[in-house]
């Protein structure tokens, strides 16, 4: 897959997909109740739109209904799925699962994948330790496993950093505050925990602290205090895909559904 950016998608065999679904059915209810409320990726009743609306709700709270400046720290993890440390993930799972048969299966599933990251993309600390890395993007179990992995960070954020306004969707997460210095103080702790506990690194080009009024790019939309607009790159991709499609095609309808969640009246007219 190369749209919107190159990604390695690994499609399991039919037999393996059945196994992944069976494992997910057993593990999801157990782990989902351990996740924080504001983790929104690949969870029942969550999703991108719920994450965006929670972001808006927190923005209103931290700005006292938009009467004060709202600052946002936006972070993105570099090469997320390919950088998951398999040893650390298995240690987390072993702390929470007592069934040895399930653990054996998880060892087999996780250990069967090897990341195709080039040496320059692997963080220095991971190269030094020669850690087995990566989860296959495309497997149902991978979506759950990365949530289990990042739950370590979520719990740290809520219980150690005491962050009040925090939203995460997969490898994208934001912190909100009326005090810019508060976010600046949080930032080094975020870097250190991700590096030392999870062996993950932030993407240097996708981290910023800015005001909500200046526009915050999060989950494909640029958010402002009273509205959101579609990100330019997302807009171009949408037009490229729909230019030769009928208005009632499934792809066009899915985009129209997405556009309902922002200020997109003119865009909708162009799609139909």
Language-model segments: residues:
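Right-hand nucleic-acid polymerase module
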Residues: 21, 126-132, 181-185, 202-272
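Conserved phosphate-binding loops in nucleotide/dinucleotide-binding enzymes
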Residues: 8-13
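Active/ligand-binding-proximal structured segments within catalytic/core domains
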Residues: 23-27
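Long, hydrophobic, well-ordered secondary-structure blocks that form the structural core
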Residues: 41-52
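Conserved polymerase palm-domain catalytic core
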Residues: 38, 58-170, 174-190, 201, ...
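Acidic, glycine-rich two-metal-ion catalytic cores of nucleic acid-processing enzymes
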Residues: 14-18
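Charged boundary/loop elements
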Residues: 29-38
């Amino acid at each position: 897959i190369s749209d919107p950016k190159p990604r390695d998608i690994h499609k399991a065999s039919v037999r393996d997909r059945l196994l992944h679904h069976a494992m997910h059915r057993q593990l999801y209810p157990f782990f989902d109740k351990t996740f924080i409320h504001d983790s929104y990726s690949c969870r029942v009743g969550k999703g991108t739109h719920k994450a965006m609306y929670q972001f808006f709700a927190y923005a209103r709270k931290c700005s006292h209904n938009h009467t004060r400046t709202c600052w946002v720290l936006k972070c993105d993890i570099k090469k997320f799925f390919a950088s998951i440390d398999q040893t650390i993930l298995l240690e987390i799972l072993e702390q929470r699962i007592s069934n040895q048969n399930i653990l054996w299966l998880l060892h087999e599933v996780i250990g069967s994948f090897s990341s195709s990251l080039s040496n320059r993309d692997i963080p220095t600390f991971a190269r030094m330790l020669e850690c087995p890395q990566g989860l296959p993007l495309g497997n149902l179990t991978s979506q759950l496993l990365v949530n289990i992995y990042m739950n370590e960070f979520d719990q740290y954020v809520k219980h150690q950093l005491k962050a009040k306004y925090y939203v995460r969707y997969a490898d994208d997460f934001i912190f909100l505050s009326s005090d810019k210095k508060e976010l600046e103080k949080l930032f080094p702790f975020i870097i250190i925990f991700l590096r030392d506990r999870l062996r993950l690194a932030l993407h240097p080009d996708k981290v910023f602290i800015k005001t909500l009024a200046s526009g915050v790019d999060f989950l494909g939309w640029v958010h402002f205090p009273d509205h959101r607009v579609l990100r330019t790159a997302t807009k171009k991709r949408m037009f490229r895909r729909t230019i030769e499609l009928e208005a009632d095609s499934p792809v066009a309808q899915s985009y129209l559904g997405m556009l309902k969640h922002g200020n997109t009246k003119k865009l909708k007219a162009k799609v139909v």
